[in-house]
């Protein structure tokens, strides 16, 4: 874990002059989309994730790839729709709905030999993983800092 950044799945990448302008939109998405109640008033979130493959973003990133499911796509759309209305913000073209590839970075800034070694290890050890998305967070990068998060 480099720079205290835990393994994570990035849903969106948003440039903003100040992270504080993003907090109300983040809270709204969390309140309206992440905690839906069923008819009995029970939280009903299908936050399953199935990590099925290993891949590479050339030239220096190796990642684990989850299957893009309805939950992740709906979350991506909700975040885009909510955050795109905030003045002086820009959402990366690589994280907009239908142009987003979910991935969990396992290593970055790898040279060719490190990449070969990583694939050799994972070829022997990787098995598909069924899990749950446990938390949604709003963070800054360079340096990394978690601003706000919601446990699911």
Residues covered by each model-derived region:
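Histidine-dependent nucleotide/RNA phosphoesterase domain, centered on the 2H-phosphoesterase fold
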Residues: 1-152
